[in-house]
Amino acid sequence: MAEWNRDETQWRQGLLLASDAVEALGLDHSEFSERTLVIVASHDCDLAQSPEKEPHIEVVIGRLAPEKDGNSTHAKNARKLHIEFTGADTFWAEFEATAKVKVDKLELNRFSPRPETTLSPERHAVFQMRLASRYRRSAFPDEFERRLNLKDFKLHER
């Protein structure tokens, strides 16, 4: 098993796992295994901590998006994110909030991140906002939702 050295780890939040890591760690997308993408969700500070303090790394299993969905970009949707990766390959990826899993830090350390694609600093900030928005959002009571859907509610006239 690989050792952990906080000063030498290549792993950072927002990096993609290479296909050999995805396969070895059994992280295939449940519906689109041939289009699987896995992104590191854990914060850099947590990644730097020793395995005794932070034994796992959170990742999100996603896929290559067939096309960009504007309703899922810029962290507008708390459940789904479409985000662009650039570099040698430029493509859109889709990640769902419910597809977050934990990976053993030492197991992941046996592998290197996917080198040819990255998130721009702006897209990385969007990814962080999306992670936070899953837990920091307004909860509307059922009665509020019901009233919005009433046909005689004034919003329906506009």
Language-model regions, residue ranges each:
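Short N-terminal edge-element motif at the start of the domain
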Residues: 1-43
